[in-house]
Amino acid sequence: MKQRTYIAIDLKSFYASVECRERRLDPLDTNLVVADESRTDKTICLAVTPSLKSYGISGRGRLFEVKQRVKEANAGRQHDAPGRKLEGSSYLFSELQENPSLAIDFIIAPPRMAYYMEYSTRIYQVYMKYVAPEDIIVYSIDEVFMDVTDYLATYKLSPHDLAMKIILDVLTTTGITATAGIGTNLYLCKVAMDIVAKHIPADKNGVRIAELDEMSYRKTLWSHQPLTDFWRVGKGYAKKLEENGMFTMGDVARRSVTDEDLLYKLFGKNAELLIDHAWGWEPCTVEAVKAYKPESNSLGSGQVLHQPYEADKARLVLREMADILSMDLVDRGFVTDQLVVTIGYDIENLTDPKRRGKYHGEVVKDHYGRQIPKHAHGTINLERYTSSTKQIMDAAGELFDRIADKSLLIRRLNITATHVVDEASAPSAKDSYEQLDLFTDYAALEAKRKQEDEELAQEKKVQQAMLTIKKKFGKNAILKGMNLSEGATAKDRNAQIGGHKA
């Protein structure tokens, strides 16, 4: 079988770079963070420029953490400054390097998600100048995989030179630089980009390109730590591995030889993928990814509330989310027969002594290691496959009432429609079987079902009319009474993309 060559490209601090270019600033020389300051200092930073990261700032930290770190860095600069005094400030890294008397400053740019999507589309068009769409996987708004196996001979270029050519074209077209990884499979090009490229010096344009094959992967990364640097190894996986004496991918590979059963006991069928990756193997190709059709589909959404919500207001928000979910189903021609809801509780439930004293349930740790009440999770089955707004909203409200602890403050909500299928292929009530008995008036039951079918058909017409209006005049062209209630979020979220300002 012909050995394949893959390139992964990650646009450097994409959102932040776009904001710099729009201000005619150099992304590599500007201290800038993309964050919605209107949401308070606890808001998550969507992107941070490389120069600002150089002060020890995380790319996905909170805004208050950025401000605190800059404050600490300025305290150090003041201590070292002539006369121990800072005069003036700058957000340009070069000026700060030249003048030790300047205080570090930075720009806070509010997110513009629709604009970033436009930029991403322009960059994808650059990629298509070199590689056909069927050989490209769009992994995220700022990251792609390419199978360039059949293009190297055409361009008479090495994988490194082709990657550089594409990246420089993107740089010329948009002013945004990138990092690339090259590998003999999708996994290797990804970890080459994520891990190896980060540890090599950038060229004058900020470009880093790293290459791996199976043998160089084992030589270079079998001893690398932490495990969470590797693609698809999260904190939970890493913790389990470390508890069993495996601290590196080399440890995992060796254990797969001596005690493979342990890995399957720990991770089930997912152990196969982990073992493959430990050895640098990945059988999946771009072609296979493109051809993949999942056995079951789901459609859902989630949101982090901007402040802790009492249960009644959180229930309102969940009903709004169910309303939007039903309209998404109608728009896509899908139906569902099951909903799943997850409710995440706020840390204040345990930090407030009065609330803490009333809570006697299970306590877990969140992503930051803080104690919070364990989330609530539940499923409700619908009587039939449907995209009815009324049926889905009523079911979501019923499920919320069943699983939510009404005494706790709520911070996160997720709702998912599972068993999603095309409406045309969905089983109907006529296709199902039921046990007959002597005490049911089946004529009345059939009349009721017929009336319900008519009501659902009428509702579908209303839903489709609403979708037409919303697409033409915007999502807020039609609002319901609940959307104007205190605590409702749909109106604001309709003006967002991915939960951030459009």
Regions found by a protein language model. Give the residues of each.
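Short clusters of hydrophobic/aromatic residues that line enzyme substrate/ligand-binding pockets
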Residues: I209-L212, L227, L299, I380, ...
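Short, well-ordered secondary-structure micro-motifs
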Residues: V191-A192, T351-K354, S425-S428
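Acidic, metal-coordinating catalytic segment for phosphate/diphosphate chemistry
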Residues: V18, G369-A502
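A glycine-rich phosphate-binding loop feature that marks nucleotide/adenosyl-phosphate handling sites
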Residues: T184-Y187, D276-W279, V335-I347, L409-D422, ...
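DNA-contacting surface of Y-family translesion DNA polymerases
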Residues: A8, A103, D229, K235-I410, ...
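Gly/Gly-Pro- and Ser/Thr-rich, intrinsically disordered tail segments characteristic of DNA damage-repair
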Residues: M1-H277, E282-V286, A443-A502
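Short, charged/polar surface micro-motifs in flexible loops or helix N-caps
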Residues: K12-F14, S38-K42, Y345-L350, V420-A424
